[in-house]
Amino acid sequence: MSDTPDLAGVWKAKILTLFPEAFPGVLGESLTGKALQQGLWQLETVDLRPFGIGKHKNVDDTPAGGGAGMVLRADVLGDAIEHAMQGTAGNWPLIYLSPRGRRMDQQMMQTFARCDGLTLLCGRFEGVDERVLEHYGIQEVSLGDFVMTGGELAAQALIDATVRLIPGVLGNQASTEEESFSSGLLEHPQYTRPADWKGRAIPDVLMSGHHGKIAEWRQDMSEKITQERRPDLWAAYQARKSKT
């Protein structure tokens, strides 16, 4: 177990996993890694294996009713969850990374960033005993409509998307306000030096210094890209505009 003392007021992610060595992984790099070192957020892993049954610390068994694969046992997960939830208080959801869960989006990440912390259960094999999800009221969350070999990568994606919304992590609040989904639209194109590359020039308006025209261009491009690439987001954006 990598138990770490809770710092008052600091957002914390607790990870229940068979592969604790997979963390922090990419979360230990760049801005999230720097913020972790600075104590702006915390990470704790809980290894499921020590909670296993018998001499071999078995954590799984065959599916009731037959079928392929193995299922993580309810008694093993229950003990691990109760260990992980010791000392947690306030708004602290239990999350299970699962392809049948609600798909992650920016609004969900904003909600998670306002929590006191999260406990994330990373599945393996054919999943987890359903009784665990029911007993603890666990929320199922999905990275997308595809199946992975385990929940660790999805957990890292969720944590990264959440941690970057915590005040002080990015250093510039405008960065989160201007990026994709913050306004319900996809982000406008970005450019930097050189001004001309392989015959492709930066749009003149961005070099004009006219902030009003730049803002208008960026809004127009965000709307155009959203309409072309994500008609679902565009329809929702139009519906919100019609109500204002």
UniProtKB/Swiss-Prot annotation:
The keyword tRNA processing applies. The keyword Transmembrane does not apply. One of its GO terms (molecular function) is tRNA (guanine(37)-N1)-methyltransferase activity. It is an enzyme of class 2 (transferase). Its main location: cytoplasm. Its EC number is 2.1.1.228. InterPro entries: Alpha/beta_knot_MTases, tRNA_m1G_MeTrfase_C_sf, tRNA_m1G_MeTrfase_TrmD, tRNA_m1G_MTases_N, tRNA_MeTrfase_TRMD/TRM10. Gene3D superfamilies: 3.40.1280.10, tRNA(m1g37)methyltransferase, domain 2. GO terms for biological process: tRNA N1-guanine methylation. S-adenosyl-L-methionine binds at residues 123, 143-148. One of its GO terms (cellular component) is cytosol. It catalyses: guanosine(37) in tRNA + S-adenosyl-L-methionine = N(1)-methylguanosine(37) in tRNA + S-adenosyl-L-homocysteine + H(+). Keywords: Cytoplasm, Methyltransferase, S-adenosyl-L-methionine, Transferase, tRNA processing. Pfam families: tRNA_m1G_MT. It is found in: Cytoplasm. Homodimer. HAMAP family: TrmD. Belongs to the RNA methyltransferase TrmD family. Specifically methylates guanosine-37 in various tRNAs. This is tRNA (guanine-N(1)-)-methyltransferase. It comes from Ruegeria sp. (strain TM1040) (Silicibacter sp.).
